[in-house]
Amino acid sequence: MAYTVEPREHSKNTTLPTVAMPPSPPSSFSASFGPFRYDTKEVNFDHWTSTKEKVVTGPYDYIAAKPGKEVRTLLLACFDEWLQVPPESLEVIGQVVRMLHTASLLIDDIQDNSELRRGKPVAQNIFGTALTINSANYVYFLALEKLNSLKNPNITDIFTEELLRLHRGQAMDLYWRDTLTCPTEEEYFEMVANMTGGLFWLMYRMMNAESSMPIDLLPVVELLGVIFQVLDDYKNLCSREYGKLKGFGEDLTEGKFSFPVIHSIRSNPEDLQLLHVLQQKSSNEHVKLYAIEIMESTGSLEYTKHVVENIVSQIQEIIYSTDEGQGRGKGILDLLHKITRLS
């Protein structure tokens, strides 16, 4: 059976009905209510205040309020013995490096599921993960904004290149942890040269760009990034002071392939116990002490000490040959002596 649609009969009156417009508000009507408050000629949408700014920077300010050992600030002064950067530029670079370092700690603590930072609860456990991530990202851009005051066209490129380097290194560290993949020592050194060395490179390259007497110390900068991370890995397992600030053996709880762990696993690949400990991500102190016993049995902690000594020797050799007796490397050598006391 076929269906047909009858055409609708149109009204002879095709005039559209008149729509009544709302009356204008009376003079007593508050400008804060009603649709008329959105008259863009009257409304100012830029109401950012210092109170709102504190909301954004709260997690960052929380960590920054209790500074660490300020090693990067000390290193800034060491590099300046060589580069003699103008004081105004040096101040900006120092502020930017501190901002980036502190902001990166906020992200690190989330990625590592940490509990303590500098002896205090981590920021995400106070402010929440989402606001903490936002705060860290915000400070990255505040740092970039601050660099614009240097009026140096090369600075932005340096900033971008070194933050890319840092995130590449961080990605590999996280990938190995999350896939339970033990890297080689060479892969580890490449990773830390990027991850830990990224901010060192950033600091040095910006100072070099602002200096009237630039000098090539990049091999020293790269080795400094490596030695700082190897030392951090060792102290995480063996330092009581470190344990009070970050928690005992936190790298084991995180499941991280730190330098002593890598050496131990590769020294005895048939023994899977240490891999299983990393997989469990245990916070049990007895389990972590047992893992350290395994590393001691493979000589991994002593091996780590020897590697540190070897890197120190390499840095000393480069500095002596570059300095030519002028004494500009004294600051770096003194700092190395201070931070490498492991016993």
Swiss-Prot record:
Mg(2+) 3 binds at residue 232. Mg(2+) 2 binds at residues 108, 112. One of its GO terms (molecular function) is metal ion binding. The lineage of its organism: Eukaryota, Fungi, Dikarya, Ascomycota, Pezizomycotina. Its cofactor is Mg(2+). Pathway: Mycotoxin biosynthesis. Binds 3 Mg(2+) ions per subunit. Residues 1-26 are annotated as: Disordered. This is Geranylgeranyl pyrophosphate synthase. Geranylgeranyl pyrophosphate synthase; part of the gene cluster that mediates the biosynthesis of aphidicolin, a specific inhibitor of eukaryotic DNA synthesis and DNA polymerase alpha. The geranylgeranyl pyrophosphate synthase GGS is required for supplying a sufficient amount of geranylgeranyl diphosphate (GGDP), the general precursor of diterpenes. The diterpene synthase ACS then catalyzes the conversion of geranylgeranyl diphosphate to aphidicolan-16-beta-ol via the intermediate syn-copalyldiphosphate (syn-CDP). One of its GO terms (biological process) is alcohol biosynthetic process. Residues 1-12 have a biased composition (Basic and acidic residues). The keyword Magnesium applies. Pfam families: polyprenyl_synt (PF00348). Isopentenyl diphosphate binds at residues 69, 72, 101, 118. Belongs to the FPP/GGPP synthase family.
